[in-house]
């Protein structure tokens, strides 16, 4: 699990992207 891993939540935050592991809306 690295910073640039787009399949992890931390990777999403580092890359500034969203997806299954990092939804835009807060539940």
From Swiss-Prot:
Name of the protein in question: Small ribosomal subunit protein bTHX
GO molecular function, one term: rRNA binding
Organism, scientific name: Thermus thermophilus (strain ATCC 27634 / DSM 579 / HB8)
Gene transcribed to yield this protein: rpsU
Record bears the keyword Oxidoreductase: no
Keywords: Ribonucleoprotein, Ribosomal protein, RNA-binding, rRNA-binding
UniProt function note: Binds at the top of the head of the 30S subunit. It stabilizes a number of different RNA elements and thus is important for subunit structure.
Keyword set includes rRNA-binding: yes
Ranges of compositional bias, category Basic residues: 1-13
